[in-house]
Structures are given as structure tokens and as C-alpha cells.
């Protein structure tokens, strides 16, 4: 093998790290994959296993926990993108933040759990941004201001 061929092979490995070592599924003894997701101050612990497609959040069905259809749709996005809707039973415990932050945390955790269960789904989920932690949090209030950026009303006289 010449130096040029060796360099090309090395360059292809470094540009595509997933080709170097195929990831193995991370599944526990019960056949479940576990992951955590975060969004704002919400932390979601997500377990997935093959099943009929039920989603249980804090011991309640998703229709009961999230009354707004937009939030339920947000949770189901990773399953829809990967064509796995109705194939996995999802059990979630989530705490902190509000309903929107919790839905975002569940979506993040579910996406990570899907990649742990089936590593081949990572290239499908990554372009949609489901595996990226959304780092936006509330800006703190500053002294001398009414809110984070809003000033008190100014009076000339």
C-alpha cells in the first residue's frame, strides 16, 4: 500500500467516525433502552421497549398528561421521523419546568433512547436536531432593571 492510499483510507476514517466503529445497542436485561433528556429545567428519564406504541408519562397516559395536541405531536416526532410509531412502548418520568419544557425533554430523551436501541437511526435523527440539547434557558433578572432586560419607566420630569 502506498502512502497516498494509506492517507486516503485514514482521511475517510477521520471524516466519518461512525464508519470506524459500528455502535452496539445499549439494551438492559429486560430488553429496554434508557436515556435522559433535558430542556430548560426539565429532566426526563425515558425507557423504551418493543410493544404496541403506548406512551406513559409519570404513570399517566400521554393524552391525560399533555392535553394540548401540539405537545403530544412534539413527543411523537422522533418516532414519526424514524417510522417507528406504534412499535415501542415508552415509559417516562419527567420533573421540573413547565409542560413545554417537559415535552422538549421527553423528545430529547426519546431520541437518545432510540439511538441506544437502534444505533442505525442516528443519521436519521441527527439532521432534525433531536439529539442536540437545546441550551436556551431563561435569562436572569438584573438589579436596577424591571426584568432581565426591561428597564423601569423613565420620566424626564
From Swiss-Prot:
The record's listing under InterPro entries reads:
Ribosomal_Su5_D2-typ_SF, Ribosomal_uS9, Ribosomal_uS9_bac/plastid, Ribsml_uS5_D2-typ_fold_subgr
Q: Which UniProt keywords apply?
A: Ribonucleoprotein, Ribosomal protein
Q: Which segments does the entry list as coiled coil?
A: none
The answer, when asked if Electron transport is one of the entry's keywords, is: no
Kindly state one GO CC term assigned in the UniProt record: cytosolic small ribosomal subunit
The biological process GO terms on file are: translation
Which Pfam family would be a valid example here? Ribosomal_S9
UniProt key word Ribosomal protein: yes
Give the signal peptide, or none: none
- One GO molecular-function annotation for this sequence? RNA binding
> Would you identify the family this protein belongs to, as annotated?
Belongs to the universal ribosomal protein uS9 family.
Which HAMAP family does the UniProt entry name for this protein? Ribosomal_uS9_B
Q: What is this protein called?
A: Small ribosomal subunit protein uS9
Q: Which species does the entry assign this protein to?
A: Caulobacter vibrioides (strain NA1000 / CB15N) (Caulobacter crescentus)
Amino acid at each position: 500500500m502506498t502512502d497516498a492510499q494509506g492517507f486516503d483510507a485514514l482521511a475517510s476514517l477521520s471524516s466519518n467516525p461512525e464508519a470506524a466503529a459500528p455502535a452496539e445497542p445499549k439494551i438492559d436485561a429486560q430488553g429496554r433502552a434508557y436515556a435522559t433528556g433535558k430542556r430548560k429545567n426539565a429532566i426526563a428519564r425515558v425507557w423504551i421497549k418493543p410493544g404496541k406504541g403506548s406512551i406513559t408519562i409519570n404513570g399517566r397516559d400521554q393524552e391525560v398528561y399533555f392535553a394540548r395536541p401540539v405537545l403530544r405531536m412534539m413527543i411523537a416526532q422522533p418516532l414519526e421521523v424514524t417510522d417507528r410509531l406504534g412499535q415501542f412502548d415508552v415509559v417516562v418520568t419527567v420533573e421540573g419546568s413547565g409542560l413545554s419544557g417537559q415535552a422538549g425533554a421527553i423528545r430529547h430523551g426519546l431520541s437518545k433512547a432510540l439511538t441506544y436501541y437502534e444505533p442505525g437511526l442516528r443519521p436519521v435523527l441527527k439532521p432534525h436536531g433531536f439529539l442536540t440539547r437545546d441550551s436556551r434557558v431563561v435569562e436572569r433578572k438584573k438589579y436596577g432593571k424591571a426584568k432581565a432586560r426591561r428597564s423601569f419607566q423613565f420620566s424626564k420630569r
